[in-house]
């Protein structure tokens, strides 16, 4: 049975792990790194770059290099958070036909799950290279505070990448799994997972208990902000640099896409450096130019300045912590451990704030970049039956309900309810002889339905004529272990029933997903073709170089016609290298190899002659050496003395 891998699909970086021989293995990618930047670049020759290669060329190709796409997944174009991102991102965010936020690259519209699928495909390939077998199943993590449509979109991304997503698991819960299974402390423990990543913030209160030899992880509550993370911290630094540069040079860099990409890179680097240093220098020569000539950017930033710039962002993480503690029904003093997850938690000011709120030092023995993928791999091993000593009880992060008379939100399932769960409630009609009801499903905490996130709607038709309030319509909400919702409505009088799996009233249709899967497969073939072409070009280059070198050394031993034939074959191969496909290059390589045979024979004959000459020389030198060594007279004299 093939392994179920664990993937942390992050906003900034992604990571893949697997349980191998009972131990969690974080798998290095082709570049040798344990995490992969969640960046996808679309090149003008049709090639798609993922990870570090995409990040390296971002400055030169900002409009076609997509990063932080997770912030758009499962979101509407008109949402306030998306509108804010449109002004900040160098790439184009557009409105899809169904109202979703999509991106546009090289004239082609792409859904965020399609872009995320490229990252997932790299994670899949990374695992396959390590395991030496095909991988088809995965557990993928999402922020705990992701709503239903964001979870659905993540699942869609997995399918497009050729993965069957066995479970969607919350990031803090995954981190708790990775932490809890390592620990030897006995007894029940309540822990807080504070997860501040590249694009999202989550906090979960989790109880770890030992129940008859089985480790039980029960999520008591969760809260967060799906639009708060390291990208926002970077943006504060970028805004500061832009304003300082404008003051000094009078030039506004915010309108220059290339400059913005360089600033993004520099801001991220400065932020990381200031976690260990008190001061850093941002030095970007030739950042822009005006009539007076090129402009250079040189700016010192202290840790204190950075902390002042992002203080309000760090403060925003504390209110969700307060709510999570209250919802869990515990006091801060009941917490045994505080676990930090996500790269942003390396910032000393963040650690200080967490310590101040929870009144205890956060644990330092959890790798903030790898814990989530490790936990996903553990959950994968539980689902495959490899581990049987772990039970995970997660919760739904937001309340779910339907719109009833007067636009009121009637909650069916309260937030922080353990999943999977099922709940039914009976409703009736609002008008006499009403033939149908529309069930509108919402997710959120507001009393008025319109203030919450609309997840979808469907009709139950064929209700027999009756006075208002008489028909009995039973509505059932069923949340599966992935946190994805299924809703049904049944007329108790007639037995008529209608049900849907909530696909956000946006989201991708089955046809769209299938089309994207086919696109992805075609891309994989194209990638394979490009890789083979690159390999053929490299081999051809090496052959040209080696033949030229040999021609310089041994060319005078060839007849003029032979030499001309080789030079012509070299020129033919060099000409075809720039434009030819693999078959054409291979044919010219073969032609050059054939033309060079005589040269090879001359080289071989020359080398043999050299070897024979060296052996003869060695034999001649050996005789006098022997005479010198065995000198009986000399030895005799020595003895007499």
UniProtKB/Swiss-Prot annotation:
State what induces this protein.
Answer: By stress conditions e.g. heat shock.
Nucleotide-binding as UniProt keyword: yes
Q: Which positions carry Phosphothreonine?
A: 200
List the Gene Ontology MF annotations in alphabetical order.
Answer: ATP binding; ATP-dependent protein folding chaperone; unfolded protein binding
Compositional bias, Basic and acidic residues, is annotated for 632-641
Q: Which domain of life is it from?
A: Bacteria
Keywords of the record: ATP-binding, Chaperone, Nucleotide-binding, Phosphoprotein, Stress response
Q: What InterPro entries would the database entry show? A: ATPase_NBD (IPR043129), Chaperone_DnaK (IPR012725), Heat_shock_70_CS (IPR018181), HSP70_C_sf (IPR029048), HSP70_peptide-bd_sf (IPR029047), Hsp_70_fam (IPR013126)
Instruction: Read off the PROSITE patterns from this record.
Output: HSP70_1 (PS00297), HSP70_2 (PS00329), HSP70_3 (PS01036)
Q: Region labeled Disordered — which residues?
A: 606-641
Family according to the record: Belongs to the heat shock protein 70 family.
For this entry, the protein name equals Chaperone protein DnaK
**Taxonomic placement:** Bacteria, Pseudomonadati, Pseudomonadota, Betaproteobacteria, Burkholderiales
Q: Which gene specifies this protein's sequence?
A: dnaK
